């Protein structure tokens, strides 16, 4: 039996009754080959559950590229499962990923918006395809993942809470989940901080203990985003126009730029322009023009609110009256105090207490009441 003193210091000892109850439940833990899922599987074992792992392959890498680390990740996941003494199942969801995540990603970029495929992957793959496969084919009572979020309550009353580690909280990426999906999921590392996760992995001598966290979009990996996009979407160069209606340069394609972007515009050193940096303040998709302004505090960078659509509320109840809460318009952002005003069941108006910069159509706005993630939607337009 593997022992971790760090685990014993940070988790309460369960009663025999709790252990016996958990022993009747089968949990399929998504194993990514990273430290978070590795430690999640161990925690579940310590809590008495019947634990098995599942490695998902969601992307078919090209033979001539070495960006996708699927083979190495699978080897690490297998090594961890062998060490923990649990079975590892393998499943290929690449077709589902292409149809339900990647094609949407390309469509949004083509339309000049900036989508977040990781949110869609959680919605369509990890908490839909994986959840269904685990329940129907593997007989799971629960699935588990290494996400830094917490769950409160069961079944119809399940709520999604921020992870205990504020630096790692991933509730922003899981706002599309329903209370039913949350109720069928366990998030073992959501109750602890990242350094403790690594310490537990060190105690156990897991191969993933020092493995660096994966960054960026899963199917792009460490490669250059611009090079990757160019393989699927032909770039359409166009003019860079100032807010004063002056053309001052050319862009390679609107899809390569985001609101608030400062670097990589190639428009420095203009005569009579002063020293202040240029920022992207808008995209004119119709005319294929990038709109820029000087200064990090230019009014065009700021929005007093937003319109959001494609709404998902965790409790699946539409908001019918004004609600004061907080919102994040991008990951790792400080909470923004705001008021939600319903327009209809599918659309809301959000007014910030203070104007905010770089609110980006296509990204997600995610709402909170204290620790509870209420849900969110896609930013349709800035106000």
Swiss-Prot record:
Record InterPro entries: MnmA-like, MnmA-like_C, MnmA-like_central, MnmA-like_central_sf, Rossmann-like_a/b/a_fold
Transmembrane segments: none
GO biological process, one term: tRNA wobble position uridine thiolation
The protein, known as: tRNA-specific 2-thiouridylase MnmA
Region (Interaction with target base in tRNA): 116-118
Record flagged with keyword Transferase: yes
Residues the entry annotates as binding ATP: 30-37, 56, 146
Keywords attached to this entry: ATP-binding, Cytoplasm, Disulfide bond, Nucleotide-binding, RNA-binding, Transferase, tRNA processing, tRNA-binding
EC number: 2.8.1.13
Location(s) in or outside the cell: Cytoplasm
Disulfide cross-links: 121-218
Coiled coil: none
Function statement: Catalyzes the 2-thiolation of uridine at the wobble position (U34) of tRNA, leading to the formation of s(2)U34.
Kinase found in the keyword field: no
Species annotation: Haemophilus influenzae (strain 86-028NP)
Protein family membership: Belongs to the MnmA/TRMU family.
Residues under site feature: Interaction with tRNA: 147, 363
A single MF term (Gene Ontology): ATP binding
Active site, UniProt feature: 121, 218
Family annotation (Gene3D superfamilies): Adenine nucleotide alpha hydrolases-like domains (2.30.30.280), HUPs (3.40.50.620), Translation factors (2.40.30.10)
Class of this enzyme: transferase
């Amino acid at each position: 039996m593997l022992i971790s003193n760090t685990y014993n210091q940070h988790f309460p000892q369960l009663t025999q009754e709790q252990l016996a109850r958990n022993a009747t439940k089968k949990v399929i833990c998504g194993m990514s080959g990273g430290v978070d899922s590795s430690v999640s599987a161990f925690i579940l074992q310590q809590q008495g559950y019947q634990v098995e792992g599942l490695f998902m392959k969601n992307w078919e890498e090209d033979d001539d590229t070495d960006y996708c680390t699927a083979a190495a990740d699978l080897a690490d996941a297998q090594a961890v499962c062998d060490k923990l003494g649990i079975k590892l199942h393998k499943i290929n969801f690449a077709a589902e990923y292409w149809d339900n995540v990647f094609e949407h990603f390309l469509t949004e970029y083509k339309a000049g918006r900036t989508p977040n495929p990781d949110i869609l992957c959680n919605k369509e793959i990890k908490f839909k395809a994986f959840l269904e496969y685990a329940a129907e084919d593997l007989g799971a009572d629960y699935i588990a993942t290494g996400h830094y979020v917490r769950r409160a309550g069961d079944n119809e009353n399940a709520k999604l809470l921020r992870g205990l580690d504020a630096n790692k909280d991933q509730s922003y990426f899981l706002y599309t989940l329903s209370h039913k999906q949350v109720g069928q999921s366990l998030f073992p590392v959501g109750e602890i901080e990242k350094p403790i996760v690594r310490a537990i992995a060190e105690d156990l001598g897991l191969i993933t203990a020092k493995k660096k966290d994966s960054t960026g979009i899963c199917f792009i990996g460490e490669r250059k985003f611009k090079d990757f996009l160019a393989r699927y979407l032909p770039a359409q160069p166009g003019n860079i126009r100032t807010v004063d209606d002056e053309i001052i340069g050319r862009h390679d394609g609107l899809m390569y730029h985001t609101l608030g972007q400062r670097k990589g515009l190639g428009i420095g050193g203009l005569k009579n322009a002063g020293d202040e940096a240029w920022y992207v303040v808008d995209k004119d998709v119709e005319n294929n023009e990038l709109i820029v302004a000087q200064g990090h505090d230019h009014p065009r960078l700021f929005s007093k609110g937003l319109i959001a659509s494609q709404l998902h509320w965790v409790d699946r109840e539409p908001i019918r009256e004004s609600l004061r809460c907080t919102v994040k318009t991008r990951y790792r952002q400080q909470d923004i105090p705001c008021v939600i005003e319903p327009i209809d069941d599918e659309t809301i108006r959000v007014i910030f207490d203070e104007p905010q910069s770089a609110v980006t159509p296509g990204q997600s706005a995610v709402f909170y009441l204290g620790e509870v993630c209420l849900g969110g939607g896609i930013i349709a337009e800035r106000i």
